[in-house]
């Protein structure tokens, strides 16, 4: 049953369950339930998962390091939905703490699948709106702003 086939109350319960499951995985240093949500075919389940990761990172300081470790692990996963959701989770964290997830964006920017690369652009846009600075990876000469991705150029689009 897809997310929006559920009633509003059931959706809220499902989001709460996703949050609890991911937090439990992080506390146990496991990834089974988180992986099932990150790889789910339903976009809204994946959205609930990446938003939960952002909330857990922000509200539970002792789990921050484990959260980043989980994202690092998932960033290398063979399933593009897992990698895409990982980028989106990094975007949730990057709104407040960009430096700790910048390397996740670096990896995703050169992913073989377009949905992962597109997630990088969308997530960095979200972060940029909050942190008010462009994302530029000097050594690779890659710049992303709120309007363009310029590979191999030092051109910056205006925001």
Label every model-predicted segment.
Residues 2-6, 39-42:
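A generic short-segment signal for beta-strand/edge and adjacent turn/coil regions
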Residues 3-25, 47-61, 83-96, 115-130, ...:
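Structural detector for internal amphipathic alpha-helices that build alpha-solenoid repeat scaffolds
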Residues 25-37, 58-74, 95-108, 129-142:
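Amphipathic alpha-helical scaffolding segments comprising HEAT/armadillo-like alpha-solenoid repeats
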Residues 32-54:
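Short, contiguous, helix-prone interaction/anchoring segments in small proteins
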Residues 41-43, 78-79, 112-113, 146-147:
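Short inter-helical turns and helix N-cap capping residues of alpha-solenoid HEAT/ARM repeat scaffolds
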Residues 73-81, 117:
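Short, mixed-charge aromatic SLiMs
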């Amino acid at each position: 049953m897809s997310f929006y086939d559920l009633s509003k109350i059931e959706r809220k319960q499902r989001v709460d369950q996703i949050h609890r499951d991911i937090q439990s995985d992080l506390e146990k240093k496991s990834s089974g339930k988180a992986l099932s949500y990150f790889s789910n075919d339903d976009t809204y389940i994946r959205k609930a998962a990446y938003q939960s990761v952002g909330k857990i990172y922000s509200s539970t300081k002792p789990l921050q390091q484990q959260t980043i470790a989980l994202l690092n692990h998932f960033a290398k996963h063979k399933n593009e939905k897992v990698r895409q959701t990982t980028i989106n989770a990094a975007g949730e964290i990057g709104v407040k703490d960009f430096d700790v997830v910048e390397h996740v964006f670096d990896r995703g920017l050169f992913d073989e699948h377009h949905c992962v690369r597109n997630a990088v652009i969308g997530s960095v846009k979200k972060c940029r709106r909050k942190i008010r600075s462009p994302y530029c990876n000097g050594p690779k000469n890659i710049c992303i702003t709120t309007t363009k991705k310029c590979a191999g150029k030092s051109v910056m689009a205006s925001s």
